[in-house]
Amino acid sequence: MAIAMTDAELKARHRRMWASGDYPSMVETFLLPLGPRLVGAAELSPGLRVLDVAAGTGNASLPAAETGAYVVASDLTPELLDAGRARAEAAGLTLEWVEADVEDLPFEDESFDVVMSAIGAMFAPH
């Protein structure tokens, strides 16, 4: 039996789900190797403008910032961005954290050299 819901309802459900658990701990346990691998595959270098879509707590954003790239981490869930901001601060990294919907990003076309997403973009309904 399918449950019909609007995109807005689905996104609100995702936002609540990601904010309700201990996602940062889960990242540390299961997903930590994924970010550096993605960054390595993207061959980032100093000065590149990088957007991490559905960045969560910065699993890929932080390793991207370590390359010297200018990084913007965007996510639908402010609680995850807060956790990422704390991780970045503890690591001495500077990057921008932006609450944003992957389906309605607030950036001009061609604002970035590289756009990446570790796993989060797959949750967007379209």
Question: Which residues fall in each region the model found?
Answer:
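Class I SAM-dependent methyltransferase Rossmann-like catalytic core
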Residues: 21-26
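A short acidic, Gly/Pro-enriched loop at the edge of an enzyme's catalytic core
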Residues: 103-115
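Residues lining the SAM
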Residues: 117-121
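Conserved alpha-helix/loop element of class I SAM-dependent methyltransferases that forms part
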Residues: 28-48
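N-terminal, positively charged/glycine-rich alpha-helical extensions of SAM-dependent methyltransferases
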Residues: 1-19
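Class I SAM-dependent methyltransferase SAM/SAH-binding core
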Residues: 49-105
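A short, conserved alpha-helix within the catalytic core of class I
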Residues: 124-126
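Conserved donor sugar-nucleotide recognition element shared by glycan-biosynthetic enzymes
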Residues: 7, 27, 31-35, 77-80
